[in-house]
Amino acid sequence: MPAYNRNERRKSMAERRPSASYAPSKIPHLTGLEKPNEHSLKLDHCDILILGTGLVESILAASLAWQGVEVLHIDHNNYYGDSSSTLTIDQIKKWCVEVNQGKVRHFSDAQIYIPGGKRTNEFNSKDYGIDLTPRIVFSQSDLLALLIKSRVYKYLEFQSLSNFHVFENDNFKSNISNTTKEHIFTDQSLSLTTKRSLMKFLKFVLQDNNDPDKKQLLLDNSQVPIEEFLTNTFGLKSPQSDELIYSIGLANRNGTRTPEAVARIKRFLVSFDVYGNFPVMVSKYGGPGEISQGFCRSAAVAGTTYKLDTTLVDFDPQLKIAKFSDGSSVKIQEKVVAAPTQVPKFLATSYKEASEKLHPFTVTRLTTIVRKDCREWMSENESSAVVVFPPESLPTHNAHTVQVVIQNGGSGVCPQGQSVWYSHTCEQNAEKAKKDLESAFEKMENAILRESATNLENLLDKKDFVVNDRGTPMLVNSFKLGESLQSFVPKETLDIVCKFGYVQTTYVNPDLSNVLSSSNATNNITQATVSDTDDIMFSNMPSSEISYDGIISEVKMLYKRITGSDEDFFDVDFEDEDDEYERAAASTSAVIDSESDINDDSDYDSVHHEPFGAGAMEL
């Protein structure tokens, strides 16, 4: 399939019309998107060859290019993003087939269900941008700081996310916004003792990490589970402890060590009021896939050569000559960096040897597109929310947290009136993980149908409400699932556009310890060496972390191995470069053709759309 095939993709960031309130500078065009692929590579040498355009690889390419390194960046796919891609539904269908054929390393058990197929379930594939590894970005984070420093933020749009819901006692609640003194002391559902305990704990979390009392307390409790620490030290128990640990801290399991949990909770708290009254943002039109593309554009302006639909077929470590599937040969002066999904066949044994001593971790994902915008779960003027199911909160007795990111049409990932539910779990037993995800989906389905029902007026009673500080009656929880609604059966059913799930393997620990801590770097494949050459390096698969934490740390590990130091990582005065940058961006232009429609039923197969021949999806 030609790489420059506009029928299979959504409009790129350079082609789409930005929001009225957002006026980006000239966005440079990118090979394989606005500019067609060259038939063969037009260079005879480069310093660094990078295989795969995932988020880590794209940031690495830009960081090297802006230091004057000649980078050749290729991808065997005909789209950008690799394992961090943002894909249309048709692309996802083909991706699932490739996964199950064993063509996509580190992914398995991909299943997709389109109720009724496209004959009765009408939709335009290109109206959807679905992330393979969805992420949220904290307002106070190293990735966001780099986006601003590198000027890549100019190519992106971000939206606030302030609603975090936690599921407990068969109810959805959103009390975790109670993270300020004002909120805590005006919350009538909390006792005075609990309010004081919360304030004491939040004050402790926000203390400087170098405070001697805080350091000693964390050291004394370094191996103590956070639940035990909250109870013994601050007198906090469930439900407040659950909200702190799993919604604010976004921990993925119970028994998280106290220092890690406190750091996670602080991440949330210090992100408030950085850009507004919210802690988290999401990138519009897609997550890691959009950001990957942004860094690729930056790298291209700095001189990186790009080519999609191209594979490395051979590399001579003595002559340092790389041969590619398009017939071209290029001398690689320094290093080759390969993403796990892009490792060529001749390096498969080397990759296996490099990773054989590493512990694999699985993350199981279930993504569902529904014809309901779920505005009931979101703050006014926002288009995203997070739902968390703590351990033991589901009928399946989930041992790990189920985390769900919800985005509706306002985020540009689907049509208006619809939403995408991204759920995942770190449960290592795949069958158990699938049951947990299905159970969480059913709870959310029942909740949104109840929430959006129009005949609720006579079902609520006084105990479903509390009075806020202004004297206004308010529902006890965000989803209106008071006790009197537990037996309410909505008349409608949830209309599903598409539902698909898959299992991903990574060598990044769910707690990110082998990425964030230099003492555990030996357990990271970025530090592994190939037996017959020092010139080949591997990057990691995306982690199970819901945020972008750990990404920059991993990029810096690779950058340091290549250059010898990470002190000059993105050490560029972009303010002085802005004029030159804008001229370079403006000079890259191409004629943008109108996209033609896809034949909706061209590859419809009811058996493959309904796994195991079932009428409903079984994950």
Model-derived features: where do they sit?
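Rossmann-like flavin
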Residues: 131-134, 140-270, 281-283
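A conserved beta-strand/loop element that lines the FAD pocket in flavoprotein oxidoreductases
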Residues: 155-159, 301-312
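Extreme N-terminal leader/targeting segments of oxidoreductases
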Residues: 2-48, 66-70, 89-115, 119, ...
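N-terminal FAD cofactor-binding segment of flavoenzymes
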Residues: 76-162
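Gly/Ala-rich phosphate-binding loop of Rossmann-like dinucleotide-binding domains
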Residues: 61, 65
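Conserved flavin/dinucleotide-binding core of flavoenzymes
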Residues: 413-619
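Mid-domain catalytic core of redox enzymes
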Residues: 279-283, 293-302, 311-453
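Glycine-rich Rossmann-fold phosphate-binding loop(s) that bind the pyrophosphate
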Residues: 52-55
